[in-house]
């Protein structure tokens, strides 16, 4: 079985080695056909604490790492402008 992947935005990085990633899912409503967006929040493992709030990341499914954590950050697609300014 292939591992699932999601792309989302980091909304919290306050935990040690864990980030919260918000993934937006858009789909047409079954009856009214209006596009509906649902946001799901995943806790993902970040081994080096390198990801900051606002970063766009790709997460992949892993074995259960804790009670709520079943995803890991695979790669950082883009850094947020605020995170880049904080480094300087």
UniProtKB/Swiss-Prot annotation:
GO CC list: cytosolic small ribosomal subunit
Keywords, in A-Z order: Ribonucleoprotein, Ribosomal protein, RNA-binding, rRNA-binding
Pfam family, one: Ribosomal_S17
Coiled-coil residue spans: none
InterPro entries reported in the protein's UniProt record: NA-bd_OB-fold (IPR012340), Ribosomal_uS17 (IPR000266), Ribosomal_uS17_bact/chlr (IPR019984), Ribosomal_uS17_CS (IPR019979)
GO BP: translation
Highest taxon of source: Bacteria
GO molecular function: rRNA binding; structural constituent of ribosome
Binding partners and assembly: Part of the 30S ribosomal subunit.
NCBIfam families: PRK05610.1, uS17_bact
Protein family membership: Belongs to the universal ribosomal protein uS17 family.
Summary of the function given for this chain in its UniProt record: One of the primary rRNA binding proteins, it binds specifically to the 5'-end of 16S ribosomal RNA.
Listed PANTHER family: 40S RIBOSOMAL PROTEIN S11 FAMILY MEMBER, SMALL RIBOSOMAL SUBUNIT PROTEIN US17M
Official protein name in the record: Small ribosomal subunit protein uS17
Classification of source organism: Bacteria, Bacillati, Cyanobacteriota, Cyanophyceae, Synechococcales
């Amino acid at each position: 079985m292939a591992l699932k992947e999601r792309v989302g935005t980091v909304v919290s990085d306050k935990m040690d080695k864990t980030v919260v990633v918000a993934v937006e899912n858009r789909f047409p409503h079954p009856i009214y056909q209006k596009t509906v967006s649902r946001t799901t929040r995943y806790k993902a493992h970040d081994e080096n604490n390198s990801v900051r709030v606002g970063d766009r990341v790709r997460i992949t499914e892993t074995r259960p790492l804790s009670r709520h954590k079943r995803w890991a950050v695979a790669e950082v697609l883009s850094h947020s402008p605020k995170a880049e300014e904080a480094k300087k």
